[in-house]
Amino acid sequence: MYDSNAYNDDIPYVIRQNDRKFVIIPYSFDTNDMRFDGNNGFIQGDDFNTYCKESFNQLLSETDDGSLRMMSIGLHPRIIGRPGRIKGLEDFIKHIKTYQNVWIPTRIDIAKHCLEKDLFNFF
């Protein structure tokens, strides 16, 4: 039904594979907890929160004309679930929940929605 191993776009898109529709849900490394691992990334939970908030706020501002946007966040329990990091994620979720027209789906929910609504067909 879907694949999320693409890095070539910011929004999902539908392709045809073996006469069936297949949703590509792009993955992102910048809003990803893997940036805690290594020397060039996040250090504190608030670093993650701040970066995600700024990304979210920018994407939200780009919807003023009716455009659709998606923000993909890669999370790994062994990384974001650490005591010094989880609060950054919790604070970010609190921030986005203050907005009325924001949907927080799983990838399978995104794929089903794209197929049901016939969104983003590029074939």
Report the location of each language-model feature:
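Active-site-adjacent pocket scaffolds in enzyme catalytic domains
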Residues: M1-S67, F123
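C-terminal domain-boundary segment and adjacent tail
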Residues: K53-F123
